[in-house]
């Protein structure tokens, strides 16, 4: 945990610049997320500098956006102009919220960079309402081109905390194996394939975009 926070603390100031290359994929992702969070109470874990939260907050009732990195949260707070958006430092494995507090939980590009992602999903399940939605877009590095795999290798050498390399299919299977019904999924073109997933606690048919 401390190694992970150290990496993100050190790179918080350059995170937004690093993510600009994937702006088109993120804009598409925002389009998918906004209808889901409309008039809902939302928790985001691993918010980073708040790129997603700031882009969708107008649709939501309120967003609690959290990250384990204090420096990331400092960056996120700098240009927060919404009274509906609150940033705080939290551990996604030990969230301070009561059971079934949120209608939507967003965990974007988080599950592949933490050890024991299944435990993070358990904590998300605890704070999500029974009829709530988990939105969990994740870079699926294993389903990548040769150049992309080389890029992932050099990121790993630079200290990027990549713990799980999934293909899109493997990632969706991982979600299902941990008690989530994937209601909608799509693979967005980015630096690495970005697998978008909307999940519920209940069983239901999968819809692939």
Segments predicted by a language model, with ranges:
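N-terminal, positively charged/glycine-rich alpha-helical extensions of SAM-dependent methyltransferases
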Residues: 1-13
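Conserved alpha-helix/loop element of class I SAM-dependent methyltransferases that forms part
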Residues: 21-40
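Class I SAM-dependent methyltransferase SAM/SAH-binding core
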Residues: 43-94
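A conserved beta-strand element that flanks and buttresses the S-adenosyl-L-methionine
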Residues: 106
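A short glycine-rich, Lys/Arg-flanked "PGG" loop and its adjoining helix->strand segment in the class I
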Residues: 118-130
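Conserved class I S-adenosyl-L-methionine
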Residues: 135-158
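Short alpha-helix
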Residues: 163-179
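Core SAM-dependent methyltransferase catalytic element
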Residues: 178-180, 184-209
């Amino acid at each position: 945990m401390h190694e992970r926070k150290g990496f993100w603390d050190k790179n918080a100031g350059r995170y937004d610049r690093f993510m600009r290359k994937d702006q088109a994929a993120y804009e598409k992702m925002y389009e998918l997320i906004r209808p889901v969070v409309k008039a809902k109470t939302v928790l985001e874990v691993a918010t980073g500098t708040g790129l997603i939260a700031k882009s969708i907050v107008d649709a939501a009732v309120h967003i609690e956006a959290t990250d384990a990195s204090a420096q990331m949260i400092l960056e996120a707070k700098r240009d927060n102009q919404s009274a509906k958006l609150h940033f705080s430092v939290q551990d996604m494995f030990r969230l301070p919220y009561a059971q079934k507090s949120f209608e939507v939980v967003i965990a974007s590009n988080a599950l592949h960079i933490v050890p024991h992602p299944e435990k993070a999903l358990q904590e998300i399940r605890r704070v999500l309402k029974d009829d709530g939605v988990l939105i969990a877009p994740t870079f699926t590095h294993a389903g990548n081109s040769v150049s992309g795999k080389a890029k992932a290798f050099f990121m790993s050498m630079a200290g990027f905390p990549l713990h799980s390399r999934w293909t899109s299919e493997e990632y969706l299977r991982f979600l299902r194996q941990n008690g989530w019904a994937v209601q909608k999924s799509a693979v967005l073109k980015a630096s690495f394939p970005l697998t978008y997933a909307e999940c519920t606690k209940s069983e239901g048919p999968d819809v692939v975009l």
